[in-house]
Amino acid sequence: MKFFTSIIFFLLTFNLNASEYKLEKVISGLNKPWGMSFINDNELFLTQKSGEILKIDLTTKEVKNYPHNLKVVQPHWQAGMLDVIYEDGEIFVSYTEDRGDDKTSTSIARGFIENDSFSKIENIFQSGSSWNNIHWGSRLMFKDGLLYASIGERGYGSVAQDPTSYFGKMIRINKDGTAPKDNPYSMNEDWLPEIYQIGLRNPQGIMLYPNDSEIFIKNHRLLARDL
């Protein structure tokens, strides 16, 4: 059974001196929105877990779907289309990919835009595939031209400490999916070169501190109160 949820987005505007704010409805009628990334002050890209990549004009309220051929699994539990980030005229999305034989992976695709649609969209990264149906992550962030992406440990726990697996890791890659030569473990032959951090469970939040130097992530831990 498919559930449609009407979600209302709000713009929150602050008056820091008077500590005043107001809520303004921007758009409604969305179906499980998961990630969004601003193009400019008036436009943004938004993903829905059901697989859509939408472009929303905050001024005209126009919602445009960007069709694609990515093998996004039917949304269930934590699976589906995940995060999106817009960078220099290109789109990067993370999603739960159907890898066949009931296996899935956290995958990242890069989309090129021409005439307000995708001229090409293709995978640049695929984590290992698994039958487990939990903990894909995933959030995306750019810093200094490099893409940071969080990958869940797929419910396998200790694999997050395994340097030969992408499960339970933060990766750092170039726009084409290759590993930067200065990644922390790139010189260690026993480690996957894309790995930036190990030991994560289900990281679903990431941000760059305002001073543009420190990265913060939110990692869902085993206990509900343990973040």
Model feature map: region roles:
Residues 11, 61, 119, 180, ...:
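Residue-level signal for pocket-adjacent positions within structured domains
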Residues 79-81, 153-227:
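Beta-propeller domain segments
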